[in-house]
C-alpha cells in the first residue's frame, strides 16, 4: 500500500470507479475533503496488488486511545477473498492507529463472516453508517419494468401522486434550497425522534458533492409547496 501521488489524487474519483466494487460515494475525494473539515485526516492510498485498488482512509485522534483509522464503505473489493491482500498494507499505512474500521461492500453470508473472522476482523459493536445493508437495483430494464416490479400499493401511491399533480424536479443548490431541504429533514426528525446534524454540516456535504458532479437535489412539489426532497449522490 502506498500513498497516491498528486496526479493520482486529482484523478481519485476515476480510480475508485475502477475498483472491483465499482466505487463508493464515501470513498470519493469530495467525501475525504468533507471529513477533513470535521477533524478527520484523509489519506489517499493505492494497493500494491496486480490491479491497484484505490482506498480512502480517514484518520481521527481519539483522546486517551490514539489514532483511529476508518475506511468508509471500503476497501473497494467485490469478494471477501480480495481483502487479505489489502489488510496488511492498511495496517502498515494506518500505523500507529490503535484500530482500523473497514466496511467492504460484500454480500453477507455465513461463509463470508467466517472468512472475515479468520482474517482477524471482528464485528464492531456500533455501526458508523446508519444503513446496515445495500440494495442494488438494476436500472437497465427501464422505467416501466421497474414500476411493474413494485408492490401494487407502491404503484398505486405513485400514480395517485401523479394524478393529483405532484411533480419531482431537480433544483439548484443554493441557500434557499438548502434551507428548504434542511427544514424538511428537521420536521422528519421531530416526528421520528432521530438525531440530526447541523444545517452547516449538510450544506458543506451537499455543496462539495454537487461541485464534484456527484450530487443533485430534487424536490417533490404540489401547487408550489415542497412536500419532500432528496439529495441523490452518484459516481
Model features per residue range: what roles?
Residues 78-81, 191:
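A generic structural signal for short coil/turn motifs at secondary-structure boundaries
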Residues 3-49, 53-65, 105-109, 114, ...:
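A conserved beta-strand-loop-helix scaffold within acyl/acetyltransferase catalytic domains
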Residues 45-48, 89-95:
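Alpha-helix C-terminal capping segments
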Residues 80-91:
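Conserved acetyl-CoA-binding loop-helix of GNAT-fold acetyltransferases
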Residues 95-106:
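Conserved GNAT acetyl-CoA-binding A-motif
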Residues 72-74, 103, 233:
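Conserved residues at the C-terminal ends of beta-strands
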Residues 65-77, 133:
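Conserved acetyl-CoA binding element of GNAT-fold acetyltransferases
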